[in-house]
Every structure is written in structure tokens, then in C-alpha cells.
Amino acid sequence: MKLKFSVIAVVLMTVYGVSKAQEDNVWKKLTGVTYEVGEDEYGELYLPVFSEDIQELEGTEVSAEGYIIPFEGMFKPEHIILSSLPLAECFFCGSGGPETVMEVMMADPIEYTSKRVKVKGTLKLNAKDPEKLMYILTDAELVL
């Protein structure tokens, strides 16, 4: 009986560990994007080409930790931009690439904070609409 309990405990801890590792590595997976040059009515643009690992995440619930980008006068508590990098290094302000940010559509409004936050929602990939970011999290909830 004791051995059976030990085996079950090890299996549960392993499953939790794998799940937690995948959750923590979502930003790492999202860096597996490449680009191809395309054109629209305004000229050349770079279109994302998502790796198989990224495509497998589409439509699944993922968690992402990061920093809310504070667009002055534009912060909407139900629609935020989340950066995997601190503000000084983010895509809009520093050296990060477009794969380091995602649009997050919150299920409930949140308050702005300069501290790191964690959100959970359904990942959508965007390769066609240049007015939106390529990663969009919908029905998101604040976890931390």
C-alpha cells in the first residue's frame, strides 16, 4: 500500500512538474517564429511564420508572465499589452522583438501595475492583420 501511494505521488509530481515547466516556457516557445516578406497595398511587410510548436499552442489555454506596457492615456483595463521583458527592454521601448509581446483581452478589467503579472487565457495566432500583434490571449484572467 505504501509503495502504491509512493508511485502515485511520484507520478502526480512529475505531471505537475511537466505542466508547470510547459506553462513557464510559453515565451520560450513563442520565440520559435520566423518571418517571410510579403506585400500589401502600402508596400513590403514581414509576415510571421509560426513553428509547429507554436501552432500546437493555438486554441489552448496558456499562462504567461510579464509586464503591462503602459501606453500613456491609452491603458484599457480589459485590453492590455503584455511584454515578457521589463519595460526598458520591451519591443516598443528597447531591444525586444515582436515575439516578446502579446495582446491580452481580459475577461474582467484589471488595474495597471508596474510589477510582473501572470495571466491565463486562450492563445490565438495572428499572421494576417498587421494592426494587431501576432500573439493574442483571449478570455484572460489575472493569475498573479
Each model region followed by its residue ranges:
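OB-fold and OB-like single-stranded nucleic-acid-recognition modules
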Residues: 20-144
